Each structure stands twice: as structure tokens, then as C-alpha cells.
Amino acid sequence: MARGSLSLPALRGGLLALLAAALFGISTPLVQRLGAGLGAFTTAALLYAGAAVVGALSLRTAAHEARLQRSDAWRLIGMAGFGAALGPVALSWGLQHTSGASASLMLTLEALFTATLAWWLYSETMDRRVWAAMLLLLAGGMALVMDQGLQGGTQLLGLLAVLLATVAWGVDNTLSRGLAERDPSQVVMAKASLGAAATACLAMAWGEPLPTLTAALGLFAVGATGYGLSLRFYLLAQRAFGAARTGSVFAFAPFIGAAVAFGFGERSAGWLMLLGGLLMLAGVLLHLAESHGHEHAHDPL
């Protein structure tokens, strides 16, 4: 029913999804600035240490929140490995070697990998509009790669590292489906703690330099909001708004990040970057329209 899609829980879910997108989108250019000169493992460890504290502070023991079970352990380890270790490490390294706006826009491909994995592993239906949206996202990503390729090898490698981060987070999103009904605070704390511990150990083993107090506190705060609160809001939004629509709204995060990067003074955008951004925006809008129509048509009476 049309009325069902405008219910208060759905509206709340939509707002939570938008807030999650804004927090994560803003975090990307901030990580680029605060992480300048730091090792990628150190940056990732500080980000997820902040996220872990948010999870710990918001822990609930309410009866309506399903607690994590032993059977969730391997799924959590996978989420931490891909989403809280490989993803942020690849992003942190990439941000130091490529354009902040390009990196933000490239993160749009997370939606492509998430949707493709859902189709492959869970047999989710993907009609022609969804495939068209995915092709637009892919074409936009190719335009960004070409743009950074023209800037030089280092810029291209940085963007490819960001692409690796989107693959890692696509796997993370796929694994998180099985924990959507668990206490989101527990999920955030467990995933972030595992990721922070792993990347901190790697930072020490790699001999990365210690950050300044300002950089450490800044990255900790960005991790608390852009990764901890963002993930919590994302999981809560999935319950009321549906996984497909939540993912589609969250796909606007890269555009928020690109806008903030331009606000910080980045002016490296060429016509290929603008073309890539427009193609990706068209893909996200098409995917959002399809997701809304699909879930709308199947609303229970």
C-alpha cells in the first residue's frame, strides 16, 4: 500500500539512513586531512577505536534487542576483516595518493558490489532497471579511473586502493545482513574492536610512526561518528526502511563527501571526473527509484 511507505517507522528509517550517509560521507575528506603523513594501519586503528567506544557506550540490555550468539562469531570476524581492517586500510592509503573528490565518488561502487553479491549469494531479483543502474555506476567508475590515470601512476594506484575498499565493504555489507536483527550496539562494538586491535597490531609490526595528539583525537572522533554512529544508524534503518532502500539512500554518502572535499578547497575536477560523478548519480537515482518501487509493491496489506 502507498500509505504504508509513508508510515512513521519508515520515515524514521529513511532519516536514519540519510544521517548514516551524511556521517560517513563527511568522514572521507576528513580522514584525508587528518591522516596526512600517517600510516594506513594507524589511521584505520584510530578510526575503529572511536567506533568501538561508541558501540560500548550505547550498549543496551533491553529485552527487545537480540544479543549476539556464538554462532555469529565467524560472521563477525569476516565483517571485521573486510569492513574494519581491509576496507579502512585501503581507503586510508588511497586517500593519501589520490584526489579526495575522486576517492569519495569511487565509494559509490560499494553499492554495485553489495547488489551484485546479494544477487549472486542470496538470489535477489535484479531487473533491467537495476542492471542499468549498476552499469551506470560501473561506467562512472571507469571515467574516474581514466581521470586519475591521466594524473599519473601514483594517483591511479591511490584510486584503485579506494576501489579495493569498496569491494571489502561490499562483502562486509553482505555479511551484515545476517546480523540486522541483533543489538546494533553489540555489532558495532564487536566489529570495531576486532578491526581496531588487528590494525593496531599491524601498525606496530610495520613500525608506523605515532600520530600527534591532534591527529589521534581527530581520527578517533571521525571514527566515532563516521563509522560507529553511522553503522549503528544504518543497522537501525534497515529494520524500518528495508535493506534495499537503506542501501540506496546510503549510496548518496560519496556525493556528500565529494561536496565537502570541494568545500575544503579541492579544485582538481576535470571533465572526466564530472562525467563520472554524473553517471554515478544517475545510477544511484535509478537504483533508489527501483528499490522504492519494488518494496512499495510488496508492502503487506
Roles of regions detected by a PLM:
Residues A20-A21, A44-L46, P88, S102-A111, ...:
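Helix-helix packing/entry segments at the starts of transmembrane helices
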Residues A17-L18, S71-A80, M126-L138, G158-L159, ...:
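Cytoplasmic-side transmembrane-helix entry/capping segments in multi-pass membrane proteins
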Residues L23, G37-L86, F113, A168-D172, ...:
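Transmembrane alpha-helices of multi-pass small-molecule transport proteins
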Residues L34, T43, L47, G94, ...:
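Hydrophobic/aromatic residues within transmembrane alpha-helices
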Residues L23-T28, A56-S102, L107, A115, ...:
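Specific transmembrane alpha-helical segments of multi-pass solute transporters/efflux pumps
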